[in-house]
Amino acid sequence: MILVDRDTRVVVQGITGREGSFHAQRCREYGTRVVGGVTPGKGGTTHEGFPVWNSVAEAARAEGANCALIFVPPPTAADAVMEATDAGIPLIVCITDGIPALDMARAKAYLATRQSRLIGPNCPGLISPGEAKVGIMPGHIHKAGTV
């Protein structure tokens, strides 16, 4: 099953943070359609050429985002997953590690009643070589072809 391709429109939660900013740039350089990011309180600004919104719902409405890439601190990551789900984002990739287990259990139970798919947390993301990467893995180590 191919989960990301050239048509995937990614919104990065935590884009103004160090990791979110760095990896949003790397994803864009790879060819991924990073449509912007979310940092509450910074909506209406831009960060390194990316538009920033206050919520995932705003980003989804404005840009048609269909994938969320999460780089927020562990105490807020489960809420970020649920926010993306509530915004109707079908694919959520959570890179954050160290999320409290009870928070993630709550988020997983919430996801079970919704249509979103979660990759992670504490994962490198995913890639369709030559198409799109959503995560932290270096693109140059992957090659398109059959497995």
Which residues does each predicted region cover?
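General beta-strand structural signal in soluble alpha/beta enzymes
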Residues: 12, 36-39, 92-94, 117-122, ...
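N-terminal Rossmann NAD(P)H-binding glycine-rich loop of SDR-like oxidoreductase domains
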Residues: 16
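Generic hydrophobic/aromatic pocket-lining and core-packing "Φ" positions
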Residues: 24, 56, 81-82
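NAD(P)-binding Rossmann-fold cofactor-contacting core
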Residues: 25-47, 121
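Glycine-rich oxoanion-binding loops at beta->alpha junctions
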Residues: 43-77
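Rossmann-fold NAD(P) dinucleotide-binding segment
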Residues: 62-64, 71, 75-98
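Rossmann-fold NAD(P)-binding glycine/threonine-rich loop
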Residues: 97-119
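Conserved anion/nucleotide-ligand pocket segment
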Residues: 126-147
